[in-house]
Amino acid sequence: MLGNELSKSDVEKEISEKGEYMQIHYLSGLLNKEIHRDTKKFIYLKLIEIYKKKNMLNDVAKMYEGIAGISIAFSEQIKNYLKATEYYIKAGFFDKADYSMRKALNEANSVEREEINFSVKDFYKKQAEEYERNLKRNSATRIYEKLLEMNITDSERKEIKERLIELYEKLGKLKEFYAMKKFEEKEFSRL
């Protein structure tokens, strides 16, 4: 079956005998064809499933962006752009995460914007904590530095700076360590 007549069961049947990389090739090729929106969404979801198994997080994020692009409901667009943002953060592509977040914010009302900002902040924090657990200190440092650029509360800012000071010391980044330490002392003396 080709075109708009291609159904989910046709796709499922076609990929059932193929290996994962052949499934990726076949499904990716279908995305370029004119097919029904529901079938296209099914294909994106199948690709997400495969990419997650292969830990191809950047590609997972791209598929979520694809779903958002074909979605009609604003809530679904926001949800999928937010998922894309999460996976771009996990993959370490912060610029792409910012771009995807801006797309979600463009579709959101003021209440949803607050929720989106909170969620994205949470994604960054969780990823930084995971990096710290896995002793990927340099990656954790990059995320904490990114968080400092975001709209965060004073208590969050203080906590992040304390974490950064600790990480800079462990990484031997003395210049950054002393600069942050000096900045912290200045901030503390103002209180």
Please provide the spans of the model-predicted regions.
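Residue-level signature for tetratricopeptide repeat
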Residues: K13-E14, G29-K33, I50, M63, ...
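Flexible helix-coil transition and linker loops at the boundaries of alpha-helical arrays
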Residues: G29-K40, K53-K54, G69-Q77, K90, ...
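Inward-facing hydrophobic residues that define packing positions of alpha-helical scaffold repeats
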Residues: L27-S28, Y44, Y64-E65, Y81, ...
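Terminal, low-structured helical/coil segments at or just beyond the last alpha-helical repeat
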Residues: R163, K170-L191
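"A position-specific structural signal for the A-helix of alpha-solenoid helical repeats
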Residues: S9, Y26-G29, L45-K46, G66, ...
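Alpha-solenoid helical repeat scaffolds
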Residues: K41-K46, I78-L82, D95-Y99, E115-F118, ...
